[in-house]
Structure formats: structure tokens, C-alpha cells
């Protein structure tokens, strides 16, 4: 009897590429989402760096008054930004080949669209890559669900809000002072501080920070000491050890006595779910609030809600906020508007009640 051993034909180039892309043995997992993520994020990053350093001023309001945003045009790290594309462009897709020249493309803020479109696609693929790696490793898929909260926020300020307002010039500038300007104008036009979804977002972010500090301090304070008093307690932990590194019973007992028993978790899994869900749900609501205000479903308006017996207004803090909003609104885009929109849209007071009779 003769046994024949035949070497398996080597995989072709495409199969080797597929195996490399989906391999979990790589130092950094690539994945099929990564095939899109890497070039798009690289394009967005390179364009952002170049534009932040050297882009010429952009006619953001479409009234031939360019706004400088780059370092070489007089800005610093705090005041610098990639200025959003011009209001003259509106919501039109404005790639380089749509402009008559590179100078025109830069003047109308073309780099802003290039950056945000590549960034949003790359960031979305990053979320897909999180799911893909979890799937390959047999993990549950909740990491990408948590990441969806900041991703939804990015979509809200860079895409949904400009769509609702009718122009990418209303998108958030890519810089520190530009972000502050975006926030101030947003408050002036939409009263975001009085929107319940934004309030839930504040509770999510600040509450998440509080719970993170509480959890970290409780765990650090209830470590099971494996070292001497002269050594750091951190040396008592070995990566991959089977034993618990802190005493959850002690932490539960401490916190239950500090507040009350049922304020403390006695289940580590439900505790960590709560730590993740609180912040994620809060930021989801904040992104949803931005997306609703994009279409002018604004925050609560309690102006002139308290009056005396004679009908005179008794000012509340809501009226003070309203005056601040009007002040901010008249200050922004000074040369693009004669009046803030709230004043311009009010009913006009008639000067003459009836038309004069003309004899002759």
C-alpha cells in the first residue's frame, strides 16, 4: 500500500490578505471596518492639521467678510480653528473638483466638509471595528453600543444640525474658541439650557464623573493587601490572576452605611452595567436634543410667565436668561442681520391705522 502526501497549495494573495485583515493575532486589529477607517481618518487628520496651520480666511457668512482660523493667519492654539464652509455653499456637497480653483475652494471653506465627512465615516467604522473585534473574540457587543453615544454627538453637531439649519456654515467649528462660539450661539437661538434632553445629558456626564470617582475610590480603598507596608499595594496584583483584587463585601458595607443599604450595589455585574448605562443614556439624550433643536424644536420658554394682578410682568430667572439670549443673538453675525430673529419675526406695529383719503 502506498500513501501519498501532498503539500496544500499556498493560499493566493487575496486569501492571505483576508486572513491578515481578520486576524486577532495582529498587534492592532484591522478588520474589514478598519480597511475603511484607516484611510478616512488619515485623510481627515492630515487635512485638519494642514488647514489648522495654513488655511486662508473663510467667508463663513457668505457676505464677503472672511474669518481667519489658521495659525499662519494670526491665530494661536486657543483661537485657531478650521472654519466651517460658507453660507453661500449651504448644504451643497463641495469637493475640490466642484470649485473653479483651489483658491475658491479654500475661500469657501471646502476643507471643513472634507474633514467632517471623512471623520464621520471613519468614526462610524471605528464603532463597527469595535463590534467586529468583539465578535472575533467571542465577546458581548456592548462596547460599540457605549461608543455610539459620543458618535451620535459628533453626528448631531457636524451633520444633523447643519441639515436642520440649512447650511454647513452652522456646523461646529473645529477649534476651541470656535466650539465656544457654537455653544453661545446655540444657547441664543435655541435656549438649549432649558431643554430637558440637554439637562439629561448634563446629569449623564456629571453623574458619570461622580460615579466613576466613587467606584474608583471605593475599589482602591478596599484592595486585598498582598504586599508589606513598605511596598505599594499595586504590586500585589498579577495580570490574569483568578483571585479578586478587592473586597466588594467591604466596599458594599462601607457605602451602605455611608448612605443607606440599598444605595450600594451587591452585584458587581449590575454595578458596572449601571456605570456604563448612566453616562451613555445621558449623552444619547444630549445628542437627541441637539438633533431636535436642529429643526427648531427648542428649549422651554417661560418668559413673562409670572404677572401681577394688573398684568405687569414680574421677572423670573427665565426672563433674565431670555435677555441674555437676545444679547448674544444680536452680537453674533453682526453684519449679516439687522435684528435678531426673535425680534425680526415679531408682529410689526402699524404706524397708520387707516389709509389717508386723497382728494383732488
Swiss-Prot record:
<feature type="topological domain" description="Cytoplasmic">
    <location>
        <begin position="219"/>
        <end position="273"/>
    </location>
</feature>
<keyword id="KW-0479">Metal-binding</keyword>
<keyword id="KW-0249">Electron transport</keyword>
<keyword id="KW-0359">Herbicide resistance</keyword>
<feature type="binding site">
    <location>
        <position position="333"/>
    </location>
    <ligand>
        <name>[CaMn4O5] cluster</name>
    </ligand>
</feature>
<dbReference type="InterPro" id="IPR055265">
    <property type="entry name" value="Photo_RC_L/M_CS"/>
</dbReference>
<feature type="site" description="Cleavage; by CtpA">
    <location>
        <begin position="344"/>
        <end position="345"/>
    </location>
</feature>
<keyword id="KW-0106">Calcium</keyword>
<keyword id="KW-0560">Oxidoreductase</keyword>
<feature type="topological domain" description="Lumenal">
    <location>
        <begin position="289"/>
        <end position="360"/>
    </location>
</feature>
<dbReference type="GO" id="GO:0005506">
    <property type="term" value="F:iron ion binding"/>
</dbReference>
<dbReference type="InterPro" id="IPR005867">
    <property type="entry name" value="PSII_D1"/>
</dbReference>
<dbReference type="GO" id="GO:0031676">
    <property type="term" value="C:plasma membrane-derived thylakoid membrane"/>
</dbReference>
<keyword id="KW-0464">Manganese</keyword>
<feature type="site" description="Tyrosine radical intermediate">
    <location>
        <position position="161"/>
    </location>
</feature>
<keyword id="KW-1133">Transmembrane helix</keyword>
<feature type="transmembrane region" description="Helical">
    <location>
        <begin position="29"/>
        <end position="46"/>
    </location>
</feature>
<dbReference type="GO" id="GO:0009523">
    <property type="term" value="C:photosystem II"/>
</dbReference>
<protein>
    <recommendedName>
        <fullName>Photosystem II protein D1</fullName>
        <ecNumber>1.10.3.9</ecNumber>
    </recommendedName>
</protein>
<dbReference type="InterPro" id="IPR036854">
    <property type="entry name" value="Photo_II_D1/D2_sf"/>
</dbReference>
<feature type="binding site">
    <location>
        <position position="147"/>
    </location>
    <ligand>
        <name>pheophytin a</name>
    </ligand>
</feature>
<feature type="binding site">
    <location>
        <position position="344"/>
    </location>
    <ligand>
        <name>[CaMn4O5] cluster</name>
    </ligand>
</feature>
<feature type="binding site">
    <location>
        <position position="170"/>
    </location>
    <ligand>
        <name>[CaMn4O5] cluster</name>
    </ligand>
</feature>
<dbReference type="GO" id="GO:0016168">
    <property type="term" value="F:chlorophyll binding"/>
</dbReference>
<feature type="transmembrane region" description="Helical">
    <location>
        <begin position="274"/>
        <end position="288"/>
    </location>
</feature>
<feature type="binding site">
    <location>
        <position position="189"/>
    </location>
    <ligand>
        <name>[CaMn4O5] cluster</name>
    </ligand>
</feature>
<keyword id="KW-0793">Thylakoid</keyword>
<feature type="binding site">
    <location>
        <position position="272"/>
    </location>
    <ligand>
        <name>Fe cation</name>
    </ligand>
</feature>
<feature type="binding site">
    <location>
        <position position="215"/>
    </location>
    <ligand>
        <name>Fe cation</name>
    </ligand>
</feature>
<feature type="transmembrane region" description="Helical">
    <location>
        <begin position="118"/>
        <end position="133"/>
    </location>
</feature>
<feature type="transmembrane region" description="Helical">
    <location>
        <begin position="197"/>
        <end position="218"/>
    </location>
</feature>
<dbReference type="Pfam" id="PF00124">
    <property type="entry name" value="Photo_RC"/>
</dbReference>
<dbReference type="GO" id="GO:0009635">
    <property type="term" value="P:response to herbicide"/>
</dbReference>
<feature type="site" description="Stabilizes free radical intermediate">
    <location>
        <position position="190"/>
    </location>
</feature>
<comment type="function">
    <text>Photosystem II (PSII) is a light-driven water:plastoquinone oxidoreductase that uses light energy to abstract electrons from H(2)O, generating O(2) and a proton gradient subsequently used for ATP formation. It consists of a core antenna complex that captures photons, and an electron transfer chain that converts photonic excitation into a charge separation. The D1/D2 (PsbA/PsbD) reaction center heterodimer binds P680, the primary electron donor of PSII as well as several subsequent electron acceptors.</text>
</comment>
<dbReference type="GO" id="GO:0045156">
    <property type="term" value="F:electron transporter, transferring electrons within the cyclic electron transport pathway of photosynthesis activity"/>
</dbReference>
<dbReference type="InterPro" id="IPR000484">
    <property type="entry name" value="Photo_RC_L/M"/>
</dbReference>
<dbReference type="GO" id="GO:0016682">
    <property type="term" value="F:oxidoreductase activity, acting on diphenols and related substances as donors, oxygen as acceptor"/>
</dbReference>
<keyword id="KW-0148">Chlorophyll</keyword>
<keyword id="KW-0472">Membrane</keyword>
<keyword id="KW-0812">Transmembrane</keyword>
<comment type="subunit">
    <text>PSII is composed of 1 copy each of membrane proteins PsbA, PsbB, PsbC, PsbD, PsbE, PsbF, PsbH, PsbI, PsbJ, PsbK, PsbL, PsbM, PsbT, PsbX, PsbY, PsbZ, Psb30/Ycf12, peripheral proteins PsbO, CyanoQ (PsbQ), PsbU, PsbV and a large number of cofactors. It forms dimeric complexes.</text>
</comment>
